[in-house]
Curated annotation (Swiss-Prot):
Protein's name according to its UniProt entry: ATP-dependent helicase/deoxyribonuclease subunit B
Species name: Bacillus cereus (strain ATCC 14579 / DSM 31 / CCUG 7414 / JCM 2152 / NBRC 15305 / NCIMB 9373 / NCTC 2599 / NRRL B-3711)
Family annotation (NCBIfam families): addB_Gpos (TIGR02773)
Binding site for [4Fe-4S] cluster: 805, 1129, 1132, 1138
Lineage: Bacteria, Bacillati, Bacillota, Bacilli, Bacillales
Coiled coil: none
Domain UvrD-like helicase ATP-binding, first and last residues per copy: 1-390
EC number: 3.1.-.-
Length: 1171
């Protein structure tokens, strides 16, 4: 029994010495005593390759490469102890979830924390840490007693409570495992116990290579190996000079020196002979003088400069993607020009979550074979999502999001259907569920679902059309596809008495869906497309899910569990599932995490993402215990994993290891922005390297080829997949701005794509964008006729839409596009309810020969309740009756109608104008409809402007009959003559024109009528602020002012007084007008003379004719208006259709100048020739 150390700095040949010794021994005595070569888990594959890589050793039974965990498995297989079921990480998390749920009421700190994402991962890691550091539940309990007895501050009490919770959960966890199961840490503890019984290990030659430190648990394994083995050789990265000095925590080799001393102490305790240490002083790894200098002087203060030609490259990149592309280009260059193999190259990084997806995509595009040494979660695989969402459907009462997450896995689809067709049908089905607000009991009820297109409150036709019947049948068929398998599982889960039966219900759910066959189809499809990684994913996921169910049954099979707990425990297990890494092929670029990788034999290393806070790592508290809490426990005798402070001290050694991996070339880079454009800073580590290599120039990796010289641009010509984007970028810039210089090779690249048989078709769509102009071509007369017909019948809103943006009009009224109908109460629905409610009250008053002025406050309230109750079942598929939230909203809407009724009552008392009719149709046909506004266009097409007028009021005096228009709005609005001039606000003046033009035939007395004005009435329930103790009358007066109607009224004092008979001088509380003492109007009055009203009406006719002419001539320009802070695109539903983009030359806003009303009126006069 002896112990031997092989020490040396990085690259000194420690592993090489050990491997050569083993190979020589195998060559001399291939059937001798066992040789164990122990390495960290990440090194096993490459060490096995290195061991049998020489010509003399092509294989071996005598020598085996193990990690500690694999050695445990080997020994337990030999001497017994492996009969207990292994519980993996997913099983641990599931068991912990169950323990926490059952202990929840007794927990002090973790009761609420258990609901946070990642809690069970942290809890599992904490328990594993306890085990690695030989801390038992009783140790934790004793620590709690000690802390509880001396807790005085809030921080001390929090730690005591946290330790109490941890010992409860740890103890429960150990009790659940005892005699039945083994987790990964238990294997190592069993290894310690069983090693003395192992004939395989007894007398073995043992090498321990690649470790820098050992946990107490691992140190016990080393102890037993020294006792059992013939000789243990341990390699450590230490400079021999360090051993001759007192240990200092700031030393580069502090951690490995401590490890050296700990192992020696164990050897002394066990009376193990300590052989003479073998120090290695040379640097055989480094073929580059610069890298040899970097290793030899890394820790020197001040930094030792290297003035020769450095094989170190430092780069900053515009962003993360540009950085990865730069790495990919350099790798291709090394392989093509310098005869590197891909396996000679490694990429090291720390923040892999930011890089891995980008690297997978770009390295594939650059045809670079690569292996990412990082396990991927299974949580996004369709099978895992299907199980999780199906259980969520059942436990969460069939919520929409859970249902359609399950649907979109496509595992609910019948096996023999065409996926593309079923996807389209399911999209329609989802639209139906959104429009009808389908969730909860509606899914499980047997009543067939109804389909009716909702049009408006006035649509009371109960007849079903053929298309509606056809859609109804399809919806009910698809409903059964979705719900039938889930309901079957739901019934089984409710009948289940034990966890085993619940797991069986999940298994049968998957079997009845033919999931194995569907996964096999996915695997075959992935292989056919060359995506072998995803092909193996589909194989692994089924095996892992089955293993998870087996583990669940083994652990808790006979226990009873609520459905909600079963769902939570299963979800926790599913979240922990990971895809196993496929061993790399013989020639791939290795992409690895700096902290976990153990590289050897690479010629070039790329260290990427070297940003401040990443390398060196920024201090952060993670896990169950903070640094301060760990230090308290450490002072009390419980040793745990290093604190953040200790980790930061070790960071220098991690970075030293990182830069000394390559033998020939070192590349260091950082992005200046992340994927979202957020600024990133270069690490101070880069400054250190620059100080050591002053001749190294910092290069910049641009994502814009136009910033580069010709020689640099040529390097961007790589694979056809990648180069296509760069040729596009360059030629697009040339097209817009032109360029100088001889860059004809981009045209050569372009010609390759357009002439290549393989790439001509693939690239045509992309390259065609070079000549793309986002311009809507004018429709032909024939197409325009086909779309709009020989008679154009449209509302005023449609005409205004055309003037806002001709393309939006084409999309809505030509192509009949519309947004997806969603079961929610929007502003148009609320507006429709307000109109209907006020009409119903007004109709009731007309039938009873009463006016608004005749109503009492109590009647206003009663009528508002009555009409809302009558309308609610008819509005938007009974949305106001669908939930408590909507019921509350219904009450708020009723209060608004009540308040509005009170104001209309007050207006009626103060006005000589009385309502003639509400919701007055024109051009709609039927009884009571006024004729449309008709136009005969120059090209022979007829146009009819139709609509419905909210309210028409009438007043009479000795000067005749006057009519005014009242339009109910759910938001504040005024009439802007600038908008009238540009054709954006034509509605009110059109309505006034229609009623005054048809007054003689429409009014009962048959008199002509003059325009009195147009006014907007804002329906709302305002809040007013009053100073002091205001009386109720004062408050009501202030509220009345909030309802002042804005618009444009006839500039006739008598007519204005008819609108507000309380007005003598001053401003009206009812309309936006006021009178001075001399009887003239105040400056802020919104008035127009009768002649101006005539000019405005004439201008409206003129505008409609122009609109009609443009529509029929096929004008569909993508030219939205913009005026001040208003723009047509702001609330447009068709932006994704027109793809308006200001950066394109063809896409610019129609800028409209805002004007004063007087200026606008003058321009209107000029247009129509009015005086």
């Amino acid at each position: 029994m002896s112990l031997r150390f092989v020490i040396g700095r990085a690259g000194s040949g420690k592993s090489t010495l050990c491997l050569r010794e083993v190979q020589e021994e195998l060559k001399q005595r291939p059937r001798g005593k066992t040789i164990l070569y122990l390495v960290p888990e990440q090194m096993t594959f490459q060490t096995q390759q290195a061991l049998i890589g020489s010509e003399d050793v092509r294989g071996s039974i005598r020598a085996q490469v193990f990690s500690f965990s694999r050695l445990a498995w080997k020994v337990l297989q030999e001497v017994g102890g492996a009969s207990r079921l292994h519980i993996d990480e997913a099983g641990v998390h599931m068991l912990l979830r169950k323990i926490v749920e059952s202990r929840k009421d007794g927990l002090s700190v973790f009761q609420k924390a258990a609901e946070q994402n990642g809690f069970f991962e942290h809890l599992g890691s904490m328990i594993a840490e306890f085990k690695r550091y030989n801390v038992t539940p009783s140790n934790v309990y004793e620590m709690w007693q000690q802390l509880d007895a001396h807790s005085s501050s809030a921080e001390q009490k929090l730690l005591a409570n946290k330790v109490y919770d941890l010992q409860l959960l740890y103890d429960d966890f150990e009790r659940a495992l005892i005699g039945k199961y083994l987790d990964s840490e238990d294997y190592l503890q069993l290894l310690v116990e069983k090693l003395p019984q192992s004939e395989y290990v007894n007398g073995a030659e043992i090498y321990i290579d690649g470790f820098h430190s050992f946990s107490p648990q691992e140190l016990e394994i080393v102890r037993q190996l020294m006792i059992c083995g013939a000789r243990v050789t341990i390699t450590l990265t230490i400079d021999e000079k360090t051993l001759a000095q007192p240990v200092n925590e700031l030393d580069l080799f502090y951690e490995t020196t401590l490890t050296y001393e700990k192992i020696k102490q164990v050897a002394r305790e066990e009376k193990i002979e300590i052989e003479k240490t073998i120090p290695l002083m040379e640097q055989p790894r480094f073929h580059s003088p610069a890298l040899a200098h970097l290793e030899a002087h890394y820790e020197a203060r001040p930094n030792e400069k290297f003035n020769g030609e450095a094989s170190v490259t430092i780069s900053t990149a515009a962003n993360l993607r540009a950085e990865v592309e730069g790495v990919a280009r350099e790798i291709r260059k090394l392989v093509a020009d310098e005869k590197y193999r891909y396996r000679d190259i490694a990429v090291l990084l720390r923040n892999g979550e930011s890089y891995y997806d980008v690297m997978r995509t770009l390295f594939t595009d650059y045809n670079i074979p690569h292996f990412i040494d990082e396990k991927r979660p299974m949580s996004h695989h369709p099978l895992v999502e299907c199980i999780r969402s199906a259980l969520e459907i059942i436990s969460g009462n069939w919520r929409y999001d859970a249902v359609f997450r399950c649907v979109k896995t496509e595992l609910l689809y019948p096996l023999d259907v065409r996926k593309e067709a079923m996807r389209e049908e399911m999209d329609e089905f989802e639209n139906y569920c959104l429009a009808y607000g389908v969730q909860g009991k509606r899914w499980t009820a047997e009543d067939p679902w109804m389909y009716r297109r909702y049009r408006s409150l006035d649509d009371t036709n109960g007849m079903i059309t053929d298309s509606e019947r056809e859609m109804e049948e399809k919806i009910n068929r698809l409903r059964d596809v979705v719900r039938t398998p889930v309901i079957r599982m739901q019934k089984r889960l409710k009948r289940a008495g034990t966890v085993m039966q619940m797991c069986e219900a999940v298994y049968l759910f998957l079997e009845e869906l033919d999931v194995p066959k569907k996964l096999e189809e996915l695997r075959i499809r992935a292989e056919e497309s060359g995506d072998f990684l995803f092909a193996t994913d589909h194989e692994q996921v089924w095996e892992e899910v089955m293993s998870l169910l087996d583990t669940f049954v083994e652990m808790l099979g006979e226990e009873k569990m609520s459905l909600s707990m079963f769902t939570d425990v299963m979800s926790t297990g599913l979240e922990a599932l990971q895809f196993a890494n496929i061993p790399p092929s013989l020639d791939q670029v290795l992409i690895a995490n700096i902290d976990h990788s153990r590289l050897s034999d690479v010629r070039a290393t790329f260290i990427i993402g070297v940003n401040e806070g990443v390398i060196p790592v920024a201090p952060m508290d993670e896990g169950m215990l903070s640094d301060e809490e760990r230090e308290v426990l450490g002072a009390a005798g419980i040793e745990l994993a290093p604190t953040t402070r200790q980790t930061l001290l070790e960071e220098q050694f991690v970075m030293y290891q990182m830069v000394t991996r390559a033998s020939e070339k070192l590349y260091i880079s950082c992005p200046l922005a992340d994927e979202e454009g957020k600024t990133l800073l270069a690490s101070s580590f880069i400054k250190k390297i620059k100080r050591m290599f002053p001749n190294v120039k910092d290069s910049f990796i641009s994502n814009d080829v136009n910033d580069l010289s010709r020689s640099e641009q040529i390097s961007y010509v790589a694979t056809p997949e990648v180069t296509l984007s760069y040729v596009m970028q360059h030629l697009l810039t040339w097209k817009r701005y032109g360029f100088e210089g001889n860059l004809d090779f981009w045209w050569d690249v372009y010609n390759f794509y357009v002439t290549s048989d393989e790439w001509k078709q693939k690239s045509s769509r992309v390259l065609s964008s070079l000549f793309y102009r986002n311009r809507a071509k004018k429709l032909s007369t024939a197409v325009s006729r086909d779309l709009y017909g020989d008679i154009i019948k449209g509302s005023v809103s449609r005409m205004e839409l055309f003037n806002r943006c001709a393309y939006a009009h084409f999309a809505q009224h030509g192509l009949s596009l519309r947004e997806r109908d969603i079961f929610k109460l929007d502003a148009p629905d609320i507006g429709e309810l307000f109109h209907a409610a006020l009409k119903k009250i007004a109709d009731k008053l007309l039938r009873e020969n009463r006016t608004w002025a005749d109503l009492s406050i109590k009647e206003c309230e009663h009528l508002s309740v009555l009409v809302i109750e009558e309308i609610a079942p008819l509005l938007q598929r009974q949305i106001l009756l669908s939930s408590n939230r909507h019921f509350y909203l219904k009450q708020k809407l009723q209060q608004i109608i009540f308040r509005t009724s009170i104001i209309l009552r007050e207006h009626a008392k103060s006005s000589g104008f009385v309502p003639v009719d509400l919701e007055v149709p024109f051009g709609m046909g039927g009884t009571g409809s006024l004729p449309p506004m008709e136009f005969s266009l120059p090209n022979g097409v007829k146009m009819e402007v139709v609509g419905r007028i909210d309210r028409v009021d009438k007043a009479e005096d000795e000067n005749g009959t006057f009519l005014r228009i009242i339009d109910y709005k759910s938001s504040s609005k005024a009439l802007d003559l600038t908008e009238v001039y540009y054709g954006l606000a034509l509605q009110m003046l059109t309505y006034l024109d229609v009623v005054t033009s048809n007054a003689q035939t429409w009014m009962k007395k048959g008199h002509a009528a003059s325009p009195a004005g147009v006014l907007y009435f804002h329906i709302h329930n305002p809040i007013v602020e009053m100073k002091g103790d205001a009386t109720e009358a004062e408050i009501e007066k202030e509220i009345l002012k909030k309802f002042k109607m804005k618009g444009l009224v006839l500039g006739d004092a008598d007519v204005v007084r008819l609108m507000d008979n309380k007005l003598s001088t001053g401003s009206s509380d009812i309309i936006s007008a006021g009178l001075k003492k001399d009887g003239s109007f105040s400056a802020r009055s919104s008035i127009a003379s009768e002649q101006e009203f005539n000019v405005l009406q004439k201008y409206v006719h003129h505008t409609f004719e122009n609109i009609g002419k443009d529509i029929t001539e096929g004008v569909i320009d993508i030219a939205p208006y913009k005026m001040g802070n208003k723009a047509a695109c702001t609330f447009c539903n068709f932006k994704s259709v027109c793809q308006f983009d200001e950066s394109l030359e063809d896409n610019q806003f129609r800028s409209l100048k805002d004007m004063k009303d007087s200026e606008a009126m003058e321009k209107i006069r000029e247009e129509v020739g009015g005086e």
